[in-house]
């Protein structure tokens, strides 16, 4: 199975919008990718984290103890909402840092950009909405 950053790189490497949509749709069952796309482009989500990259120690990639394909489930504790309402700020930020330190460094970069809601180069909101019509509100 590919890392999330590899899936995004595959989409970025295609030139035509139709091809980008097709590549995204080929990963329809990968919820980690869909969560990253939604977290990046859904402006109704509010990340309850400081902006930018926190101080964390990236692992070497080849020895990442976890994978974003499983760890994306922790996103619910990082946004303002029901799951995170009783979570102290320090605990939330430590959870975020632990997540970043446990996944591949390039996936950690994807997560940092997502929580800053920084657009993904080569993967526009329009393309995401066409690939997954019900993922992001228009």
Residue ranges and their predicted role:
Residues 1-138:
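N-terminal nucleic-acid-engaging modules of covalent nucleotidyltransferase systems
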């Amino acid at each position: 199975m590919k890392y999330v950053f590899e899936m995004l790189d595959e989409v970025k490497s295609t030139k035509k919008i139709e091809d980008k949509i097709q590549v995204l749709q080929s990963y329809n069952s990968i919820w980690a990718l869909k969560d990253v796309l939604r977290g990046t482009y859904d402006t109704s989500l509010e990340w309850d984290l400081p902006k930018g990259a926190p101080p964390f120690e990236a692992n070497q990639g080849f020895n990442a103890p976890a994978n974003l394909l499983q760890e994306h489930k922790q996103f619910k504790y990082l946004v303002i909402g029901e799951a995170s309402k009783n979570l102290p700020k320090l605990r939330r930020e430590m959870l975020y840092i632990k997540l970043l330190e446990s996944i591949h460094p390039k996936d950690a970069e994807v997560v940092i950009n997502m929580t800053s809601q920084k657009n993904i180069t080569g993967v526009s909101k329009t393309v995401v909405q066409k690939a997954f019509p019900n993922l992001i509100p228009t």
